[in-house]
Amino acid sequence: MPNHAEQLAQELNLSVKNVQGAIELIDQGNTIPFIARYRKEATGSMDDQVLRDLGDRLEYLRGLDKRKEEVTASITEQGAMTPELTAALTKAKTLAEVEDLYRPYKPKRKTRASIAKARGLQPLADAILQQDAAFDPEKAAADYLNEEVPDAAAALAGAQDIIAEAVSDDAACRAELRRYYRAFGRIASAKAKDEDSVYAQYYDFAEPLNKIPGHRVLALDRGEREGFLKVGIQVDAERAAGIVSWMFARKKTGGASAAVVDAAARDAYSRLIHPSLENELRGELSAAAAEGAIKVFGDNLRQLLLQPPIRGKTVMGLDPGYRMGCKVAVVDPTGKVLDTNVVYPVPEFKRVDQAKKTIKAMVLNNGVEVMAIGNGTAGHETEEFAAEVIRELAEEKNLHLQYMVVSEAGASVYSASKLAAEEFPQYDVNLRSAVSIARRLQDPLAELVKIDPKAVGVGQYQHDMPQKRLNETLDGVVEDCVNSVGVDLNTASAPLLRRVAGVSAATAKNIVAWREEEGAFTSRAQLKKVKGLGPKAYEQCAGFLRLPEAKNRLDATAVHPESYAAAKALLDACGYTAAEIGTDRLAGLPGAVKAKGAGTLCALLGVGEPTLNDIVAELCKPGRDVRDSLPKPLLRSDVMGLDDLKPGMELTGTVRNVIDFGAFVDLGVHQDGLVHVSQISDKFIKHPRELLKVGDIVRVKVLSVDTGKKRIALTMKGVPQQN
């Protein structure tokens, strides 16, 4: 089987040597986070996203190789393989090309052509295809009459069917038409039902295949699936049929036979080729659109998971509701539940005063510093209530609290899950969601890993995606995020541990069980005692599991145990000790390394320069968190309503979702505003992701407010952004 390193290197603009190194590491069963972090010398420091792209493409190419082998075996078994066909199959770069080459040899169901062949009309078709000017098809057809072929017209019709299928099966013809469709084809839609719907804009719609954005393709697919739209591909049918005829019919020299071939070619186009290409190209559009949407979902999920935690704060979580009340939970800085309650802050229940007393008492008794408010049903009323309580506490107790509206997407799913029941068996389902909302503010990553990634509310058309591919991508994103941050071995939950490279769900439970039976881990080496965690799993996971209080200070860092000897030798060579890891004294380590020379130290330690740089960074700042450099969450102390917004107002908000046509920004009015892609920058950008990501803090200007439809149009053009 081909190696593919050269092709992948060219496609991804990487060196062949590094691609080969990455392929070997993947084939050896190493995880992507491990390769990205601890095998940089072999890959040229490819990051996890590049490695995943490489892995996906490698899987496609190997699937292509396998299909070529299957097709070759089938054609060879039929005794139809030729050197030319072998060369064409070897050269084919896509599955579509392989299937085009296989089409004439592929076992077919009963067709008009197969019926004609069974009636003995293949020789007549072959003779007509020769297009000899002296040949008279109608006269020759008389020689093929039988019980099933009553006259010359029937014989010619059967021969034409055979020729049409041969034309349709021709790989060169399909390739030429495919190019034509891609260059000049349009996807078009019309209404299938006489009724208004959300698809009204597509009732008379057409857009070039090579220009239509993915989100419109997905909208058309959904509208068709729901029965509101009729969707197809439009081209100049006469011109397309003419291309087919031009490729097969020799009109100037072929005599009467050429007319039959011309008719067969045009029939092949309208009856066989167009429907087939329409399905194929629409499938390609849908697949590309789905892949694009999955990428957007993955990017949004990555930013959501990597939102900076609010550390060291006691947080009150409020899960708003009407009939069931507002569920309240207070958690300490470690996430431990201190207090719970249910209040009714919505005015219509006439229990607002009692709700205020309860909340104030919980704040004062537990030292609450921040409130996290869910954005679901009754969210705005609860936000107004919380802002009023904060104002009163400032006046009455000189206590200055802040709050943040938190997405509660997936909270109800989690609260009713088996996992939540195991974690909080003593609490009602509704109170569990309040705990989850509070913890999301404290550490979004640790809390959100407990929820199915599809439920966190940052995707588009996610239910229309190929679910296997969507799950693989989102699971990869979660894994990359967890490992880029690192996990405290002694406090991490089983759901968080199972996202660590090399750790299965069963092994994660075994780690937790070991802690419960043996007490806290005191060294990474103790991981080897955990049931089911063998040498390979230990190699993959050890560097991502941290012990901040460990006696061996290296266990608190991202330095892999395989590099401990090198780290200690580095410290010794530069005049430091392991006891000084993480202290101010090690601030001079980078300078000492520079003075001695990286090359000299690499030779002494037996490591590459990327590993040396990582070791130095970790020794200076053990367990550093990549999230600390990102924009901090936007906390508020007062509330605005939709009616307070006026065109021209400039506000600060948080990007909540990025999709193909724009970004939704939380302004603190309980209704996200839309910055259309055309309003993001004064310069042209193709996709909002070029400038925005989930969690970004941005300045925006209000363009318009539609209170009836609850729509806010925003712009970033001409609005200075804070650095």
Language-model segments: which ranges?
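Short beta-alpha connecting loops at secondary-structure transitions
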Residues: 19, 340-347, 370, 416-429, ...
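Long, charge-rich intrinsically disordered scaffolds of nucleic-acid metabolism proteins
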Residues: 97, 404, 410-411, 415-485, ...
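Duplex nucleic acid-engaging cores and interfaces of nucleic-acid transaction enzymes
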Residues: 34, 50-52, 60, 64-317, ...
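Long, charged amphipathic helices and adjacent flexible linkers at domain junctions
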Residues: 280-289, 293-298, 455-486, 603-643, ...
